[in-house]
């Protein structure tokens, strides 16, 4: 019996195949597949799912036929299930959103909250009765506070203000120009509006903000602390929807933004100010969470093992 878990995100698609004991037999990576609508979206989605699953099957040495599969997607599952059924040979199928599989990966099948800060951001939780709630995750136009994209957007804003003479001096200005080859912050702002700088490429500049903060730039430090504060706020919002005051709650963090010690420790401090809350890193990745959901679909209470250590 074979089981499939897929994490289809804004940056990459990761597939894991496991046997009935929970042992991971193969993994595969392909391009992003978060949007089906729009020019070429359907074709990219199909290519990403097929590519990641075929790569995982090749590594495992198995045919692509599954007892159960769970796939979680950024951008929601509503327009994707029919396509998945066309692509996969599977008996039992769950198509859900990426926050749901991230939560299962982060805290297992227990109650808790996962707060994700990668290209975008969201907080998502589940109580002991299975009730779920979310906060944030509104996308880059209306939300994604504390995400990598948002941090870079804020960094460009302070760089523009400094350049135009209505903001304080900041090393973020020179950092952004050095990293992108732009001559001015104004030029970079216009480049960010072009197809040369998709959101993922803009978000990829976020670690440079952390490096600038490490060199003592006050505005860079403030941006990171503010981002951590916003992530703590959406976490508190989910807690308030699901848990009573003082009730023990496990909060897990996930995503590249938490690679910053400043963000991570400020977030932990703010979350643990709430009575009963403990914060720490996610136990497993969203792809492992998807695999765990696939096991549950088939009525198996097994834990994944032999999980690849290097996963996007």
Regions picked out by a protein language model, each given a short descriptive name:
Residues 11, 74-77, 119-122:
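Short glycine-rich anion-binding loops that position phosphate/pyrophosphate groups of nucleotides
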């Amino acid at each position: 019996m074979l089981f499939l878990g897929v994490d289809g995100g804004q940056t990459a698609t990761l597939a894991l195949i496991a046997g009935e004991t929970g042992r991971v037999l193969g993994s595969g990576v392909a391009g992003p597949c978060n949007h089906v609508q729009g020019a070429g979206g359907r074709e990219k989605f199909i290519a990403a799912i097929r590519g990641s699953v075929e790569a995982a099957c090749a590594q495992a040495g198995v045919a692509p036929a599954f007892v159960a599969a769970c796939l979680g997607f950024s951008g929601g599952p509503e327009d994707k299930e029919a396509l998945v059924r066309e692509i996969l040979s599977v008996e039992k199928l769950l198509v859900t959103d990426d926050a749901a599989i991230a939560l299962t990966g982060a805290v297992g099948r227990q109650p808790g909250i996962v707060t994700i800060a990668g290209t975008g951001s969201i907080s998502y939780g589940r109580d002991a009765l299975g009730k779920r709630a979310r906060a944030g995750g509104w996308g880059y136009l209306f939300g994604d506070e504390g995400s990598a994209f948002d941090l870079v957007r804020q960094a460009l804003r302070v760089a523009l203000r400094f350049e135009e003479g209505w903001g304080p001096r900041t090393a973020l200005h020179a950092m952004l120009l050095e990293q992108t080859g732009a001559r001015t912050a104004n030029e970079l702002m216009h480049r960010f509006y072009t197809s040369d700088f998709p959101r993922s490429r803009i978000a990829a500049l976020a670690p440079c903000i952390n490096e600038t903060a490490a060199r003592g730039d006050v505005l860079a430090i403030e941006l990171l602390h503010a981002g951590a504060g916003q992530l703590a706020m959406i976490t508190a919002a989910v807690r308030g929807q699901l848990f009573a005051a003082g009730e023990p709650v496990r909060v897990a963090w996930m995503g590249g933004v938490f690679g910053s010690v400043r963000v991570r420790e400020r977030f932990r401090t703010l979350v643990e100010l709430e009575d009963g809350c403990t914060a720490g890193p996610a136990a497993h990745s969203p792809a492992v969470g998807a695999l765990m959901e696939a096991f549950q679909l088939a009525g198996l209470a097994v834990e994944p093992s032999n999980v690849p250590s290097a996963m996007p």
